[in-house]
UniProtKB/Swiss-Prot annotation:
Role played: Nucleoside triphosphate pyrophosphatase that hydrolyzes dTTP and UTP. May have a dual role in cell division arrest and in preventing the incorporation of modified nucleotides into cellular nucleic acids.
EC primary class: hydrolase
PANTHER family documented for this protein: BIFUNCTIONAL DTTP/UTP PYROPHOSPHATASE/METHYLTRANSFERASE PROTEIN-RELATED (PTHR43213), BIFUNCTIONAL DTTP_UTP PYROPHOSPHATASE_METHYLTRANSFERASE PROTEIN-RELATED (PTHR43213:SF5)
Example GO biological process: nucleotide metabolic process
CDD domains in UniProt: Maf
NCBIfam families per UniProt: maf (TIGR00172)
Protein name: dTTP/UTP pyrophosphatase
Amino acid sequence: MTRQLILASQSPRRKELLDLLQIPYSIVTSNAEEKLIRNFSPAENVKWLAEQKVRAVAEQYPDAVVLGADTIVYYDGAYLGKPKDAEDAERMLSMLSGQTHSVLTGVCIKDGERCETFFEETEVSFWPLEEKEISAYIATGEPFDKAGSYGIQGKGALFVKQIKGDYYTVVGLPISKTMRMLKTFDLHSF
């Protein structure tokens, strides 16, 4: 019997990355509230958020293996989520200009009573950015559905001076470690 894998995410980037594994899956969007816990560390928060997404979907599909993830950008004690508007995106990108920040992605996989979570953290350093670069980037519309207001897999890559860690963690799903974890759930393509 083929086991059903569900991706508890509407992120097109997570879908593209999961497609690389060539494991059949379906998508069910989680209705879990994405609220950070004040006294949690960034790592604890990102794992907790991923688990909340998974548990919300697993309640509806108790016989499936459910995979969920959440990504946060963390800089100077602040969480940088998806921007509310162009002004918020400009504020975030100006803050990250010429600086190094952390991107953390938490992953949760649940099968019945078994629930495994992990996170990966990557440091991203930006070049110093000019106001006109930031404005032009915001005008593309790319920042608006991304934590930290940039997509490393798109035009936002032009701002990146270097990364330390897994590139796919920044995109939204550390795919290599995710594949290895799915293997422990007996889900793999090779």
